[in-house]
UniProtKB/Swiss-Prot annotation:
The lineage of its organism: Eukaryota, Metazoa, Chordata, Craniata, Vertebrata. The keyword Membrane applies. Residues 30-408 are annotated as: Required for laminin recognition. Changing residue 74 to I: In MDDGC9; no effect on dystroglycan expression; impairs alpha-dystroglycan glycosylation. Keywords: Autocatalytic cleavage, Cell membrane, Congenital muscular dystrophy, Cytoplasm, Cytoskeleton, Disease variant, Disulfide bond, Dystroglycanopathy, Glycoprotein, Host cell receptor for virus entry, Host-virus interaction, Limb-girdle muscular dystrophy, Lissencephaly, Membrane, Nucleus, Phosphoprotein, Postsynaptic cell membrane, Receptor, Secreted, Signal, Synapse, Transmembrane, Transmembrane helix. Residues 724-735, 859-870 have a biased composition (Pro residues). Residues 880-895 are annotated as: Required for binding DMD and UTRN. It comes from Homo sapiens (Human). Residues 736-746 have a biased composition (Basic and acidic residues). This is Dystroglycan 1. Residues 316-485 are annotated as: Mucin-like domain. Monomer. Heterodimer of alpha- and beta-dystroglycan subunits which are the central components of the dystrophin-glycoprotein complex. This complex then can form a dystrophin-associated glycoprotein complex (DGC) which is composed of three subcomplexes: a cytoplasmic complex comprised of DMD (or UTRN), DTNA and a number of syntrophins, such as SNTB1, SNTB2, SNTG1 and SNTG2, the transmembrane dystroglycan complex, and the sarcoglycan-sarcospan complex. Interacts (via the N-terminal of alphaDAG1) with LARGE1; the interaction enhances laminin binding. Interacts with SGCD. Gene3D superfamilies: Dystroglycan, domain 2 (3.30.70.1040), Immunoglobulins (2.60.40.10). Residues 819-895 are annotated as: Required for interaction with CAV3. Autolytic cleavage produces the alpha and beta subunits. In cutaneous cells, as well as in certain pathological conditions, shedding of beta-dystroglycan can occur releasing a peptide of about 30 kDa. SRC-mediated phosphorylation of the PPXY motif of the beta subunit recruits SH2 domain-containing proteins, but inhibits binding to WWW domain-containing proteins, DMD and UTRN. This phosphorylation also inhibits nuclear entry.
Length: 895
């Protein structure tokens, strides 16, 4: 070309035109016309020396196009059928493996009978996986001769990928999924079965077989199921509104969650019939079908994943400016040939090299650099090998080499900054038709969460050409070998760690222990690599460390954050996670901990209360002792997951601890389960069992335990055991629609307890009143001997006129008793000069009354005196008035 240009300056215009056309024809003759699309893409980048290699490559192993790329979602089944008839002919051997490797990824399984590739990816399998399908034929000497090959990709999306997209990807009928999909802001009702299994220990075939067995048991299609491992020991969902037990007595493995969708925004009344899950899970039929113990099940409403807000982290980045100095010329490097060693096929991972930024306070005139192009040719092997880069010593900065995603095998150069010691300006490097713009080496001022970098698609046995920009100074050239690993190279400054994935938000509940393991991909450092190699520190605002008494604690050795909030911590709390590398530089991630109130509230079916020896202040003021108490209580119940215990209260009176068990369903009353848990920890009289005491000692010594019902079981007492009450037999109950179970239990209490007690009390009261009246009445008609004697002594008998016998009149007590032989007395002597008393008229009247009687009735009976009294007469002064006078006795008649 230089000769042509030189001659064109000397020849006339017609000669110049002829030479120009001749040059164009010669240049076109160097490029063959290939129908392949890959050759058409590379015809502006490959030199003539590469055409023979490329032609041999296409003739040796033709690439078959026809296997489309696939996508998979974490926790959902993946299945693709490989069209082997397009790849292999009769007698060929099909080999499926990861591109450049001998085996498939750990989550994929190849079924040679059905020619299907299936598997179930986990969270650690996110990213792009390239699968190579090759056909080989057995040669005469026993070696395998490659025939055809094809490479396709499978991209694994995270679990919180769009539900509609993930289900549509796995479902054979997209129309069915669209019809049953929920609205964008509508929660999805999910039924989850908790299995005592470890997915990381299963082979891909065992995971798929587990889904097939659940499909035959529950009649739910595979594309609707999701199988993920338990994270942070959270076996149970605190937001579940229905739950039930399984047949597993205790959890041994890490645990697996197998779930499927029931509907949209369902509640307890609108949930479809789940008897096919509830009874088999409890009785063991589901465990026998699946081959793994069933811990329990629950139903909860899952809100659709909302886009996370983007946090920005500001770094102290310099501003690139031009440097002052004379123009320099980049020296052209002669082409060098790098021959890789004949090793096993391997795919080079994408690498990224960050060059140091350029800062100069004085702007100047930009220098002129000449862009050169060095040809690095790679010998074709079974798998593309990343070539090592050769650069000049001194202050030469190697160019950044990164494969693009669309042009196979082409390594895209990026702009490289010059260190401050040189006098050149950062060159502007251009690439021919790049599919993706190159990344500048300077650090940007904002950072966004990035996904796993998508690796380029490998193409079997294709050579690559690398375009490298060289910047040199006057130092003598010396060959050095550079790598792109994470180990710091000599002379490069330490770079601060970068925040890759935000922690963003942590949810916790009052009284429930939580723990969060910081993922290893949260931060990344170019020298120290992943997060587990960095030193993490949890701080509050203004660089204040979290105290020992804080309800949130962080273990920097295991990089585990844990805590136990109480009711005073309800709300949103902001914390900062600092990651520091060995050089002392750090990065910060701000995240929030949202503390929610107890989802069950006061509706827990049972409350467990235990009394321990000790001072309650020692437990209340020490978060570590509270956490240890919760862990020991969970261990006493046989649960490895501490989130099954919700601490309600710690009060005085030694140490009185009240808690609830989150594994118990709210409705209906789980009487048998509560009784089983009660018998596990306490005797019938409330004394703790030895197993419970051994689980909590020596830190906590229990003295008594009480288990009382609450919520749907509030009318029951479990510990201490109450003697059973005799309940009369009843007829089979009639189903009454829309009857409240709580109201029914209240009616039973009134019917069997309150009403009989009131009736018995009323009967006893009436009987007492009747007995008292009868006693008073009987006592009123009887007198004692003393009362009778007093009556006789003090009283004078009164004889009424009607009571006298006229035939035989009683003798008069006023007349003297005269016998029959008795003679009349002598008349009284008369004395002379006797004065007549004033009462003479009375005596005279009296004598006059008696005298005629004696004269007229001489036959009158003699006088009979009354019988003598047994007691002396007392109190004769009280004689009643208006007494009927006695009739006078008959007159006395002398014989």
């Amino acid at each position: 070309m230089r000769m042509s240009v030189g001659l064109s300056l000397l020849l006339p215009l017609s000669g110049r035109t002829f030479l120009l056309l001749l040059s164009v024809v010669m240049a076109q003759s160097h490029w063959p016309s290939e129908p392949s699309e890959a050759v058409r893409d590379w015809e502006n980048q490959l030199e003539a020396s590469m055409h023979s290699v490329l032609s041999d490559l296409h003739e040796a192993v033709p690439t078959v196009v026809g296997i489309p790329d696939g996508t998979a979602v974490v926790g959902r089944s993946f299945r693709v059928t490989i069209p082997t008839d397009l790849i292999a002919s009769s007698g060929d051997i099909i080999k499926v493996s990861a591109a450049g490797k001998e085996a498939l990824p750990s989550w994929l399984h190849w079924d040679s009978q059905s020619h299907t590739l299936e598997g179930l990816p986990l969270d650690t399998d996110k990213g792009v996986h390239y699968i190579s399908v090759s056909a080989t034929r057995l040669g005469a000497n026993g070696s395998h001769i490659p025939q055809t090959s094809s490479v396709f990709s499978i991209e694994v999306y995270p679990e919180d990928h769009s539900e509609l997209q993930s289900v549509r990807t796995a479902s054979p009928d997209p129309g069915e999924v669209v019809s049953s999909a929920c609205a964008a802001d509508e929660p999805v009702t999910v039924l989850t079965v908790i299995l005592d299994a470890d997915l990381t220990k299963m082979t891909p075939k065992q995971r798929i077989d587990l889904l097939h067995r659940m499909r035959s048991f529950s009649e739910v299609e595979l594309h609707n199921m999701k199988l993920v491992p338990v994270v942070n020991n959270r076996l149970f969902d605190m937001s579940a509104f229905m739950a039930g037990p399984g047949n597993a007595k205790k959890v041994v493995e890490n645990g697996a969650l197998l779930s499927w969708k029931l509907g949209c925004s369902l509640n307890q009344n609108s949930v479809p019939d789940i008897h096919g899950v509830e009874a088999p899970a409890r009785e063991g039929a589901m465990s026998a079908q699946l081959g793994y113990p069933v811990v329990g099940w629950h139903i909860a409403n899952k809100k659709p994943p909302l886009p996370k807000r983007v946090r920005r982290q500001i770094h102290a980045t310099p501003t690139p400016v031009t440097a002052i100095g004379p123009p320099t010329t980049a020296i052209q490097e002669p082409p060098s040939r790098i021959v890789p060693t004949p090793t096993s096929p391997a795919i080079a991972p994408p690498t990224e090299t960050m060059a140091p930024p350029v800062r100069d306070p004085v702007p100047g005139k930009p220098t002129v650099t000449i862009r050169t192009r060095g040809a690095i040719i790679q010998t074709p092997t079974l798998g593309p090998i990343q070539p090592t880069r050769v650069s000049e010593a001194g202050t030469t900065v190697p160019g950044q080499i990164r494969p693009t995603m669309t042009i196979p095998g082409y390594v895209e150069p990026t702009a490289v900054a010059t260190p401050p010691t040189t006098t050149t300006k950062k060159p502007r490097v251009s690439t021919p038709k790049p599919a993706t713009p190159s990344t500048d080496s300077t650090t940007t001022t904002t950072r966004r969460p990035t996904k796993k970098p998508r690796t380029p698609r490998p193409v079997p046995r294709v050579t690559t050409k690398v375009s490298i920009t060289r910047l040199e100074t006057a130092s003598p050239p010396t060959r050095i070998r550079t790598t792109t690993s994470g180990v710091p190279r000599g002379g490069e400054p330490n770079q601060r760690p970068e925040l890759k994935n935000h922690i963003d938000r942590v949810d916790a509940w009052v009284g429930t222990y939580f723990e969060v393991k910081i993922p290893s991909d949260t931060f990344y450092d170019h020298e120290d690599t992943t997060t587990d190699k960095l030193k993490l520190t949890l701080k509050l605002r203004e660089q204040q460390l979290v105290g020992e008494k804080s309800w949130v604690q962080f273990n920097s050795n295991s990089q585990l954050m844990y805590g136990l909030p109480d009711s005073s911590h309800v709300g949103k709390h902001e914390y900062f996670m600092h990651a520091t590398d060995k050089g002392g530089l750090s990065a910060v991630d701000a995240f929030e901990i949202h503390v929610h109130r107890r989802p069950q509230g006061d509706r827990a079916p049972a409350r467990f209360k235990a009394k321990f020896v000790g001072d309650p202040a020692l437990v209340l003021n020490d978060i570590h002792k509270k956490i240890a108490l919760v862990k020991k209580l969970a261990f006493a119940f046989g649960d490895r997951n501490c989130s099954t215990i919700t601490l309600q209260n710690i009060t005085r009176g030694s140490i009185v601890v009240e808690w609830t068990n989150n594994t118990l369903p709210l409705e209906p009353c789980p009487k048998e389960q509560i009784a089983g848990l009660s018998r596990r920890i306490a005797e019938d009289d409330g004394k703790p069992r030895p197993a419970f005491s051994n689980a909590l000692e020596p830190d906590f010594k229990a003295t008594s335990i009480t288990v009382t019902g609450s919520g749907s079981c509030r009318h029951l007492q479990f510990i201490p055991v109450v003697p059973p009450r005799r309940v009369p037999s009843e007829a089979p109950p009639t189903e009454v629609p829309d009857r409240d179970p709580e109201k029914s239990s209240e009616d039973d209490v009134y019917l069997h307890t309150v009403i009989p007690a009131v009736v018995v009390a009323a009967i006893l009261l009436i009987a007492g009143i009747i007995a008292m009246i009868c006693y008073r009445k009987k006592r009123k008609g009887k007198l004692t001997l003393e009362d009778q004697a007093t009556f006789i002594k003090k009283g004078v008998p009164i004889i009424f006129a009607d009571e006298l016998d006229d035939s035989k009149p009683p003798p008069s007590s006023s007349m003297p008793l005269i016998l029959q032989e008795e003679k009349a007395p002598l008349p009284p002597p008369e004395y002379p000069n006797q004065s007549v008393p004033e009462t003479t008229p009375l005596n005279q009247d009296t004598m006059g009354e008696y005298t005629p009687l004696r004269d007229e009735d001489p036959n009158a009976p003699p006088y009979q005196p009354p019988p003598p009294f047994t007691a002396p007469m007392e109190g004769k002064g009280s004689r009643p008035k208006n007494m009927t006078p006695y009739r006078s006795p008959p007159p006395y008649v002398p014989p």
